[in-house]
Amino acid sequence: MQATAIIAASGIGKRMQLREGESKQLLEVGGFPVIYHTLKAFQMASSVKAIYIATRLENRSILEELAAASGFSKLKAIIEGGKERQDSVYNCIRAIEEEKRLTGASAEIILVHDGARPFIRSEEIDEIARLSMQYGACVPANRPKDTIKYVGENPEFFGETLDRSKLLQVQTPQGFQSNLLIQAHEQAELEGWYATDDAALVERFFPEQPVKIFETGYHNIKITTPEDIPVAEAIFSQISTRS
């Protein structure tokens, strides 16, 4: 089984309250940029044969130097990101398709991951790839710890409480058989339809396709706000102690 990874790393990190030109993927955790940890996990995953990163152009040289210095040999291309995350992923998909046209190289599975999730484990990546091959699609998730409620018609008040036992917090990498994901993105591009994750595109355009759940722990956080940095440092410290 061969998987290609797409890493979305072009977000400007508004909620991180960074200065103009800064990128949350380049913030340091454990003495290394966030994206270093992310790339290392995919480099170590035996199922992954190639990695494409979507990022801002001003980060290209930094990522090239990081990959060369760290021996990230699977990094195939650094692609310019789009206006939205979905555009960035689609830019990578088009690059993957162009590589296939030129060389005949193709992947059975495409994994789409948030660059700001640095603690996914290589064995989890391999298992998601395996389940994606078996079921067509697989998405990692964990169970919410908090009670979740709808906001009422009056947005200053709550509506009903949701059944927490039927809810999951969705994460990445999300895995798909390649043709399925490519067709979903192509259709979304034609219709101008946007979703917050890739599984939602598959759900919309291929409603008959089941999406396998892969439950993870709470280590696979997405670094989104300043409060996430000390949490990430604590997770890194715990991981380093165990290894």
From Swiss-Prot:
Which superkingdom heads the taxonomic lineage of this protein's source?
Bacteria
Gene Ontology MF annotations: 2-C-methyl-D-erythritol 4-phosphate cytidylyltransferase activity
**Site features described as Positions MEP for the nucleophilic attack, chain residue numbers:** 164, 222
Question: Which family is annotated?
Answer: Belongs to the IspD/TarI cytidylyltransferase family. IspD subfamily.
Per the UniProt record, which residue ranges are transmembrane?
none
Q: What is this protein called?
A: 2-C-methyl-D-erythritol 4-phosphate cytidylyltransferase
Q: Which UniProt keywords apply?
A: Isoprene biosynthesis, Nucleotidyltransferase, Transferase
Q: Which PANTHER family match?
A: 2-C-METHYL-D-ERYTHRITOL 4-PHOSPHATE CYTIDYLYLTRANSFERASE, CHLOROPLASTIC (PTHR32125:SF4)
Free-text function comment from the UniProt entry: Catalyzes the formation of 4-diphosphocytidyl-2-C-methyl-D-erythritol from CTP and 2-C-methyl-D-erythritol 4-phosphate (MEP).
Instruction: Give any single GO term for biological process.
Output: isopentenyl diphosphate biosynthetic process, methylerythritol 4-phosphate pathway
Q: What is the lineage of its organism?
A: Bacteria, Pseudomonadati, Chlorobiota, Chlorobiia, Chlorobiales
Check the record and name the Pfam families matching this protein: IspD (PF01128)
- What reaction gets catalysed by this protein? 2-C-methyl-D-erythritol 4-phosphate + CTP + H(+) = 4-CDP-2-C-methyl-D-erythritol + diphosphate
Under which pathway is this protein filed?
Answer: Isoprenoid biosynthesis; isopentenyl diphosphate biosynthesis via DXP pathway; isopentenyl diphosphate from 1-deoxy-D-xylulose 5-phosphate: step 2/6
What is the disulfide pattern of this chain?
none
The UniProt record lists the EC number as: 2.7.7.60
> Which residue positions does UniProt flag as site: Transition state stabilizer?
15, 24
